[in-house]
């Protein structure tokens, strides 16, 4: 079962053709998906990709609600970080201080700027 879940996640996250889509009532599969996604800190990304690929209607409603709740919370938290980063950016620029952002701070302002909810940050 875990092999199927891992294959599903790889295909989902890397925009590959999904060769196996579990039945909506396959509770064991969906529970394992949550466990693996949680352990890899990718639950918001899983929600985002399911939504992006139009697959949310094919998963259990309680799972959809759970994934959305985590995605939404993460998006709000990341937006708060972006606001703080922008404030720091302005202060440093106003004082002619050379700087650059690293890690999550950089990623939020560049790579993830149009979808800030997909990556969990811990900086």
Question: Where are the language model's segments positioned?
Answer:
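Catalytic metal-binding acidic patch
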Residues: 113-123
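Helical scaffold of the NTase/Pol beta-like nucleotidyltransferase catalytic core
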Residues: 2-10, 14, 18-103
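Short secondary-structure boundary/hinge segments and terminal tails
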Residues: 55, 110-111
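Short, solvent-exposed loop/turn segments at secondary-structure junctions
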Residues: 106-108
């Amino acid at each position: 079962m875990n092999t199927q879940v891992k294959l599903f996640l790889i295909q989902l996250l890397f925009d590959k053709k999904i060769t196996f889509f579990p039945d909506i009532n396959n509770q064991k599969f969906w529970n394992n998906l949550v466990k693996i996604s949680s352990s890899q800190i990718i639950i918001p990304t899983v929600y985002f990709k399911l939504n992006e690929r139009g697959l949310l209607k094919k998963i259990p409603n309680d799972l959809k609600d759970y994934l959305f709740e985590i995605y939404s919370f993460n998006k709000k938290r990341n937006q708060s970080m972006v606001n703080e980063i922008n404030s720091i950016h302005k202060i440093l620029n106003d004082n002619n201080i050379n700087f650059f952002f690293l890690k999550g701070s950089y990623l939020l302002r560049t790579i993830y700027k149009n979808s800030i909810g997909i990556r969990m940050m811990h900086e």
